[in-house]
């Protein structure tokens, strides 16, 4: 009897775990695209930005960095900008969820940009933009870019860090 109870408990636990995973996957369509994020400074980080189409509309943008994790809570600010990474005037299109230094991950649902325009998967694929993740939210470390990458229509542009422009935290 105790053996049957263990199997029943194990089966229920697996059903709950698998059920939670499928619920999460049900929020997406099959459309997604990943963009590489290049090191933007002497800090040893690279990454990947993955955009997924949401069934309810809009997109989820997930940033995953590769590099040194922290054991302390700290968050790297991340932004989606209009224009390519080397555009001299590239205003912020959307503040993204900060990257947690402990997990090196961030997720943001985007349905509308700061300018009021609607964002969906098809628009993101042709969006003239780029992503930057900063070392700090303000102060001198704000100008330190951990990773940078073009997205949407700019995805095939090669990154040349000498041409990277800084961004204003208040340019939206």
Place the predicted regions along the sequence by residue.
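Bacterial N-terminal signal peptides that target proteins for export
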Residues: 1-9
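N-terminal leader/targeting pre-sequences
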Residues: 21-77, 82-172
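C-terminal motif of bacterial Sec signal peptides marking the signal peptidase cleavage site
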Residues: 16-19
